Amino acid sequence: MAAVMALTVLRSRITRWPQWACAGPAPFCAVRRSVFGFSVRSGMVCRPHRCCSSTAETAAAKAEDDSFLQWFLLFIPATAFGLGTWQVQRRKWKLKLIAELESRVMAEPIPLPADPMELKNLEYRPVKVRGHFDHSKELYIMPRTMVDPVREARDAGRLSSTESGAYVVTPFHCSDLGVTILVNRGFVPRKKVNPETRQQGQVLGEVDLVGIVRLTENRKPFVPENNPERSLWYYRDLDAMAKRTGTDPIFIDADFNSTTPGGPIGGQTRVTLRNEHMQYIITWYGLCAATSYLWFRKFVRRTPGV
């Protein structure tokens, strides 16, 4: 019992006096490793080997962690730079598309080709037709809001009106081609969807029309499916509409000049595209610059506290 107490006092003194715990020998008798965890050599007490190796391992692990963090954080400005450059390319593509679209819409009207396959390369191209309407087979695409061409060009695709209504789509027999097509006559407010409320605007007899060629519209997310049996149309589906009305799958938007008093308001083609890529370019390049500066301060200049 006395021997154990003596060894306990010895260990407390070694812990209290750091100079005794150095790597060199100390003038004490040998102590078993199983009691204190010290290594023994020639009867001398030595500092445990694992203390020195643990310090070196900790320093190496810290250096490895710093290296990983350095390259991981560099990924943020690199990604932001890549996204900014991608938006530059997207903006060039969008400007080219807008210019092409504007040139098509402003072109002189051409006679409507009778072959639907030929129309696939003519979307947004003005065409001219002559014939008469069949108002007994009207279809309604709704809900829709009215497009004001002047405001549409200014607001670049935003809704031009808050009033909800429908587009009136009417079969039109082309007397010169011998085919029947679908014509979007234009917008009517919800209270005027019923044709009985707008008899004055139901055009009779042969007329000349200028319209914009349109193709089938892809259904957007959250837009319901069309229901031809119940005559519910939410987006433009040429094949389904043609089958329902017995017409050819050819569709044009009548221009604003086709508008008659009391009838649908023509010119309901959205010919502008929203171009917000410059905002994205500024955002991504700004994020790249900010994160690059912070990374430089942290890992290159080694600013304290950063």
Curated annotation (Swiss-Prot):
GO terms for cellular component: mitochondrial inner membrane. The keyword Heme does not apply. GO terms for biological process: mitochondrial cytochrome c oxidase assembly. Signal peptide: none annotated. PROSITE patterns: SURF1. Its main location: mitochondrion. Component of the MITRAC (mitochondrial translation regulation assembly intermediate of cytochrome c oxidase complex) complex, the core components of this complex being COA3/MITRAC12 and COX14. Interacts with COA3. This is Surfeit locus protein 1. It comes from Rattus norvegicus (Rat). The lineage of its organism: Eukaryota, Metazoa, Chordata, Craniata, Vertebrata.
